Design a protein with these regions (language model features):
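Membrane-interface micro-motifs in multi-pass membrane enzymes
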Residues: 115-170, 278-281, 333-343
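Membrane-interfacial loop-to-transmembrane alpha-helix junctions, especially the N-terminal start
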Residues: 10-14, 112-119, 182-186, 229-238, ...
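Start-transfer (signal-anchor) and selected internal transmembrane alpha helices
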Residues: 1-26, 111-120
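Transmembrane catalytic cores of multi-pass membrane glycosyltransferases
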Residues: 31-40, 47-50, 61-63, 202-207, ...
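Hydrophobic/aromatic-rich transmembrane helices and adjacent perimembrane loops
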Residues: 206, 328-356
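Transmembrane-helix motifs of polytopic, lipid-linked glycan transferases
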Residues: 83-112, 161
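Short hydrophobic/aromatic helix or loop-helix immediately within or flanking a transmembrane segment
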Residues: 40-47, 53-82
């Protein structure tokens, strides 16, 4: 993505950033105290043996969040529940900051408070809640903002960094007609981040690898092999993290260290277990991104970076619909996490497009028509639903 001249953030922007950080940290901290997934992960954090990294990895092959929590417990001498809330709250704030910086770097002419405000909305929205369709706001629907699962919270800022970095590579490749190599520094950074994402939760690479592969195959066909060199470079960038993911897969499913019975193909069994209609649930989750991709396509503003996000969503949907764990863990939905991360990235591109079309220097107030009104109305529905989801978790005591 090309860097553009940015407007200074200004006092209003900094105030909005500060308010957003306080809101998101508080939400992350409070939901950590009630989230049902936290208990087992907190016990793992307390049981870690950092002095034996090999044994630690064999016992817990995705230890990133647990190591952070362990470190906070030792540093602050606090209860593990407090440490968990601090770590998750800070990770959510980090995701917000990364989104803010990357949006400002890629969309010209945005005021700081505009980006800060819409960035906050991005990190509060959920699927549109329709009680008579599905009584629970998350189960069966999904959300771009997972509050109750610490490892998903841990991998999300890493996933966003990788996406922003690789999307910039993809756009540059196409712009330069595949005549130049991927910058070595960017490739190394992305490769290291991919390894870190596996150590946080391998769900992201499960959608990233097939998406980038699919894009390269599409380009090989469209451009008659011109992108082959860049495709090989991307493959080499992914190999170290792929090795880590394979090792994690073997430990998780076939080493006897877990209670998983392996993987099975179970079409629609898990995805359809808690919803009357998978298709309607997806529409309620993706109404705003779908509308924005249509509006952006009409304006001819779609980028190959946007396409990469939607390809990740495609593969996330495939894994979610088809795969499950055998035995008692079948309905844990562990092949849904990659889908949720892809949903977040599609939402990120949608909010960025919304800012670009209706708030950047390219647009003025008198150019906001029916599309703006409709998109804003749908976004408000998602926001209200997201706020209710937080109330459902924290105030009503449904920690999922």
């Amino acid at each position: 993505m090309e860097k553009t001249q940015k407007i200074k953030i200004g006092a209003t922007g900094w105030v909005m950033i500060a308010i957003s950080i306080m809101i998101l940290f508080t939400c992350g901290f409070l939901t950590a105290l009630v989230g049902i997934d936290y208990g087992p992960h907190e016990q793992i954090a307390l049981s870690l043996t950092p002095g034996d990294p090999v044994g630690l990895f064999k016992a817990h092959p995705e230890p990133f969040w647990h190591l952070l929590t362990y470190g906070v417990v030792k540093l602050l001498h606090c209860r593990v529940e407090i440490a968990a809330g601090i770590v998750s709250g800070l990770l959510i704030v980090l995701t917000y900051v990364i989104a803010f910086v990357t949006i400002r770097n890629t969309v010209p002419g945005l005021e700081g408070h505009e980006v800060a405000g819409l960035d906050l909305v991005l990190h509060l929205v959920s699927a549109i809640y329709v009680p008579f369709f599905n009584k629970e706001p998350f189960l069966g629907q999904g959300t771009p903002n997972i509050w109750h699962n610490p490892t998903t919270i841990a991998v999300r800022p890493i996933a966003l960094l990788i996406f922003a970095l690789v999307a910039s590579m993809v756009i540059r490749m196409r712009k330069e007609e595949f005549e130049t190599n991927i910058p070595v520094g960017k490739a190394i950074a992305a490769g290291l981040l991919l390894i870190l994402s596996c150590l946080a939760k391998p769900s992201f690479v499960q959608v990233f690898y097939p998406a980038i592969f699919t894009l390269m195959v599409i380009w090989l066909i469209m451009f008659k092999g011109k992108n082959l060199r860049n495709a090989i470079q991307l493959m080499l960038m992914c190999l170290p993290s792929l090795a880590v993911m394979i090792l994690q897969f073997v430990i998780a499913f076939y080493s006897g260290h877990s209670n998983s019975g392996g993987i099975t193909i179970a079409p629609f069994a898990v995805a359809g277990a808690r919803t009357p209609s998978i298709a309607i649930s997806m529409m309620l989750l993706l109404a705003f991104p779908l509308l924005m991709v249509i509006l952006t396509a009409i304006r001819k503003e779609l980028t190959w970076g946007d396409a990469l996000a939607w390809l990740m969503l495609l593969w996330g949907t495939i894994w979610r619909l088809l795969l499950a764990e055998k035995g008692e863990r079948m309905y844990h939905g562990n092949f849904t996490w990659g889908y949720m991360l892809a949903v977040y990235l599609v939402w990120y591109t949608a909010v960025r497009s919304y800012l670009k079309l209706y708030f950047s220097e390219q647009m003025t107030g008198n150019k906001r028509g029916v599309g703006f009104v409709l998109a804003t109305a749908v976004l408000v529905l998602h926001l209200v639903s997201g706020l209710y989801y937080l109330i459902y978790l924290v105030v009503l005591g449904h920690g999922m």
